[in-house]
């Protein structure tokens, strides 16, 4: 049984862009393409839900955070540094048959997959506004990321 997940809201929680070596770096980029390093992290946290008086909560709320850090370097000189934490509030209908692992997968795979196109657009606009070509991130396989993290955790427990 798949959890019923709904987006209740989404927002930029934190955004930082540094362009420390402009305009020098623009001249350097015309000769040398930048090296771009990207790190991605996904986390989730339960949010308190107050059901109407006399009723039990049948919906659980979670905040899912998609953190992307990007560093662009040209000839060992930082071109730009971009850090964004893009969040969404998601609801999951509680069901007795729903296993915790299914909820975890929905929050760490499905939810960031929903958020990703929006954060990708923000990054493209910010890099463009800073004078760089718009950075279009490749699609991220959140399922593979999740499975890799599970495998690393299992190896760490041995």
Curated annotation (Swiss-Prot):
The keyword Transport is assigned to this record: yes
Classification via Pfam families: SecB
Subcellular localization: Cytoplasm
One GO CC term on file: cytoplasm
GO MF: unfolded protein binding
The keyword Chaperone belongs to this UniProt entry's keyword annotation: yes
Coiled-coil boundaries: none
Function: One of the proteins required for the normal export of preproteins out of the cell cytoplasm. It is a molecular chaperone that binds to a subset of precursor proteins, maintaining them in a translocation-competent state. It also specifically binds to its receptor SecA.
Homology family: Belongs to the SecB family.
SUBUNIT field: Homotetramer, a dimer of dimers. One homotetramer interacts with 1 SecA dimer.
Protein name: Protein-export protein SecB
Protein's organism: Anaplasma phagocytophilum (strain HZ)
């Amino acid at each position: 049984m798949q959890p019923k997940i709904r987006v209740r809201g989404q927002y930029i929680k934190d955004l930082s862009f540094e362009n420390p070596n402009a305009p020098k770096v623009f001249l350097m980029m015309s000769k040398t393409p930048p090296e771009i390093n990207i790190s991605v992290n996904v986390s989730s946290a339960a949010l308190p839900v107050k059901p109407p008086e006399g009723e039990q909560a049948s919906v659980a709320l979670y905040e899912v955070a998609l953190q992307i850090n990007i560093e662009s370097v040209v000839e060992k000189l930082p071109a730009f540094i971009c850090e964004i934490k893009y969040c969404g509030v998601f609801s999951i209908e509680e069901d007795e048959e729903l296993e915790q692992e299914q909820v975890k997968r929905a929050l760490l795979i499905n939810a960031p997959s929903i958020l990703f196109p929006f954060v990708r657009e923000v990054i493209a606009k910010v890099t463009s506004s800073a004078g760089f070509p718009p950075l279009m991130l490749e699609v991220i396989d959140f399922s593979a990321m999740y499975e890799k993290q599970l495998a690393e955790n299992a190896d760490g427990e041995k």
